[in-house]
Regions:
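Cationic-aromatic interfacial patches
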Residues: 1-18
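Short glycine/threonine/proline-enriched tight-turn/helix- or strand-capping micro-motif at secondary-structure
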Residues: 32-34, 57-87
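Extracytoplasmic
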Residues: 38-40, 47-51, 63, 71-75, ...
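Residue-level recognition of beta-strand microenvironments
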Residues: 55, 97-98, 121, 142-145
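Short, acidic/hydrophobic/Gly-rich beta-strand patch recurrent on exposed beta strands
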Residues: 66-68, 77-79, 106-111, 158
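Short, well-structured beta-strand-loop connectors
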Residues: 85-94, 126-142
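Zn2+-dependent peptidoglycan hydrolase active-site motif and core
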Residues: 88-123
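Conserved, short, structured surface segments that act as functional micro-motifs
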Residues: 131-176
Length: 176
């Protein structure tokens, strides 16, 4: 008998080329206390002038021409033109904006460990609470500080750390 013809061999299937995806690197979770901004190593003055028209009094009373009495001056008054832009001294986050009968319109910005109170600003705030700001960003304009209205135009700047008042000039210049 003659051999039976065999069926042609089945071709061996060629596996389809695969592209192996790189496994995604797992990002560590962001800690709850992570800052929302990069903390600035250096600070700038918030107005064009570094001239102080009334210094921080470190708890000692100084005479107030407007109020006609002796009182502690908890901030530093920097000479500025009315309408001049007020700039953030460093990167930070706006904690609040409000109007105070003595300080006028106030923007509070957290700059690292410090809270800066920019006082006597125009009625139109240029920033909002929880907004992240960069050093040099305009946050308001100079107008008047009601409790210091007899003084020449200026920005009243206060700095606090853990609720304690500090000399703004020392903080800006890196002394504290």
């Amino acid at each position: 008998p003659s051999p039976k013809p065999s069926a042609p061999p089945e071709p061996t299937p060629t596996p389809a080329p695969t592209t192996q995806e790189e496994p995604e690197e797992e990002q560590p979770p962001v800690p709850a206390n992570a800052p929302l901004y990069e903390i600035s190593q250096e600070m700038i003055y918030p107005v064009g002038s570094e001239e102080i028209c009334k210094a921080y009094s470190a708890g000692a009373p100084v005479y107030s021409t407007t109020m006609r009495d002796w009182r502690v001056h908890a901030g530093t008054d920097l000479t500025a033109e009315s309408g001049e832009q007020v700039l953030a001294c460093a990167n930070g986050i706006v904690k609040q904006t409000y109007t105070d009968s003595m300080l006028g319109n106030v923007v509070v910005v957290e700059h690292g460990d410090y809270d800066f109170y920019y006082c006597g600003l125009g009625e139109n705030f240029l920033v909002e609470p929880e907004e992240v700001v960069s050093a040099g960003q305009a946050i308001g304009t100079v107008t008047a500080v009601p409790a210091e209205s007899a003084d020449k135009p200026h920005l009243h700047l206060e700095v606090r750390r853990d609720a304690a008042y500090l000399d703004p000039r020392s903080v800006i210049e890196g002394i504290n």
